[in-house]
C-alpha cells in the first residue's frame, strides 16, 4: 500500500505547528524561527494540500503597513509557486499581554473592541487568500476565580462578538463561515465553551447560526476525558463540523499536541473510520507541535508522520469495513436495527402494540448477548495488522 500523501488527500498544517520553536513554560526555544514561505515549500514537498495561519504567524505583531504588505507578498509568492491553498485562517487573541483577561470576553471594554477590529482585519486577509473557514479559539476567554467573571455576562459579550462578525462577513458578501474551537482549560484555569457540546448549544443562540460550526481538536476533547469520535459524530449529526484539528493526546493532562496517531491510537482509528464513512469533505488539518527535542529534520519527519498515520488508519478502517466477517459481526450486533426508527408507525401504533410492553419478554431480551466483544476484536485485528 502506498502511504505517500498527495494534495488530493487535503492534508493541511498550521504555520504555528511546524514553526513552533519548542518554547514552553519551563524552557526557552530549541529551534530557530521558521520562515512561513519555507514552511509552505517544505510542506508542499511532503504532499500537503495547504497551510493555515494566525495573523501573527504571518505578520509579526506590531508590523508597519509596509512590513505587513511585504510579509503577505512573500507568502503569496510561495503559495503561487507551490499551488498550496489557504482553506482556513484565525486570529491570535491570546499571546500579547493585552489579552491576559481574554479578548471577546475581557472585562476591559476597550480590549474587546480592539479584539474585534484585529479579527476583522485578518478576516479581510483570509478571504483575499482564499479561506472559506475562520476558526475562533478563545484560549484566554475564561477565569481562575469565581468572582472574576460573571459567566452570563461573558457569554452575552461572546454572542455579541460573533453576531458582529457574522454581520460583517454578510455585509461584505464574503463566502466565509466560522468554526468555534472548544477547549476545557489551558492557558486559563477554566475556558468558556469547553467542549463540542457547549459550543453547539451556544451556536443556537446566535443571530445567524447557519454561519457557525465547530472546529474540534483531538487533544482538547480528550483533556476533558471525552470520547473524541463521539463528539465528531454529534457535530456531523448537527451539520456543524466545519473544520477539524488532528493531533495526539495521551489521557487527561496538559495539551500535548502530539503528531496524529501518536496518542490514543484506538480513538484515532475510529475517528478516521467515521470521517471517511461520513464523507467529510473538509481539510484534514494537523494542529500539533513537533517535540522540542527535534531539530528541523525531526520537524519534517513529524509532519510527514501525521499524514502517513492518517493514510494507514484510513486503509485499515476500509479493510475492516470490507471484511465479510466484520459484516457478519455487525449484523450480529444489530447495527441494522439501530438504524431503523423505533416507532416508524407512529405513537398510536406503539401504544396499541401489546408486544411492545404487555407481552414483551424482558428476561429473554436481557439474556440475549450483543456480540460486541467479537466485533471489537475484529477491529483490533485490523488496527494491529493481524488481518
Curated annotation (Swiss-Prot):
One of its GO terms (molecular function) is magnesium ion binding. Binds 2 magnesium ions per subunit. Keywords: Carbohydrate metabolism, Cytoplasm, Isomerase, Magnesium, Metal-binding, Xylose metabolism. Its cofactor is Mg(2+). Gene3D superfamilies: Divalent-metal-dependent TIM barrel enzymes. GO terms for biological process: D-xylose metabolic process. Pfam families: AP_endonuc_2 (PF01261). Its EC number is 5.3.1.5. One of its GO terms (cellular component) is cytoplasm. InterPro entries: Xyl_isomerase-like_sf, Xyl_isomerase-like_TIM-brl, XylA_actinobac, Xylose_isomerase. Mg(2+) 2 binds at residues 217, 220, 255, 257. The active site is at 54, 57. It is found in: Cytoplasm. It catalyses: alpha-D-xylose = alpha-D-xylulofuranose. Mg(2+) 1 binds at residues 181, 217, 245, 287. Belongs to the xylose isomerase family. Homotetramer. This is Xylose isomerase. The gene is xylA.
